[in-house]
Amino acid sequence: QKHITERMSKDINRLKVVLAEKKRTNKWLAEQLGKDPGTVSKWCTNTMQPNLETLVEIAKVLEVDTKDLLWSIKDNK
């Protein structure tokens, strides 16, 4: 049980990193998606995760592959 909890506390998405690479802000992304900036902020801190449909939208807006928005499970041990 402890192992599962530790795994869940690790970062899942790379949104903050990708936004920085693209020189874009949380606010810009929120506007593009029609989402609340507070929600996008929670995604960036991995407090919450976007659903899969939203992840695809984010990838399109940022012109990246969806896999670029997620940390590799292999690297996240």
Could you describe each region identified by the protein language model?
Residues 1-25:
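A short, Lys/Arg-rich alpha-helix, primarily the initiator
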Residues 19, 30, 59:
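The alpha-helix within a helix-turn-helix
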Residues 20, 34, 45-47, 74:
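Residue-level detection of the helix-turn-helix DNA-binding "recognition helix"
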Residues 23-42:
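Short alpha-helical DNA-recognition segment
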Residues 24, 50-53:
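Residue-level signal for the short linker/turn that defines the boundary of a DNA-recognition helix
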Residues 53-68:
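DNA major-groove recognition helix of helix-turn-helix/homeodomain DNA-binding modules
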Residues 68-77:
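Short amphipathic recognition helices of helix-turn-helix/homeodomain-type DNA-binding modules
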